[in-house]
Amino acid sequence: VDSVLGSARAFVVHQNVKETIFKIQKDLWLLMADVASLGKEPNIGSDHVKDLEQTIDKYTEELEPLDHFLVPGETQGAAFLDVSRAVVRRAERSMWRLSETEEVHESGIRYLNRLSDLCFTLSRYETEVK
């Protein structure tokens, strides 16, 4: 997830999107630490999830309502964000599978769920905002 988001950051054209992705990458380091040390107090909590939701709302305010399906790949940055979304969804499913045998912090799973939505929103932003 971190690597593909780094690739997206290299290609997006909006500076605010670059900054948002970089912040997410730092959060992912915390999430990776949580997964590496299951059973300990999590670094990623509900405040991180709330922050993602607020970020999604902030970007969504600048977008037109969505009334059609989107075809991925309008720009290089958007394409990498589309791939990032798929990779994040895969990571979320892996966390759910892991939770069947290990004590996984629910906040980490919620974070990944919201992150995939943010990737979708950022891809739209890269495509639609000039």
Set out the residue ranges of the language-model regions:
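Phosphate/pyrophosphate-binding loop motifs in nucleotide- or prenyl diphosphate-using proteins
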Residues: 2-130
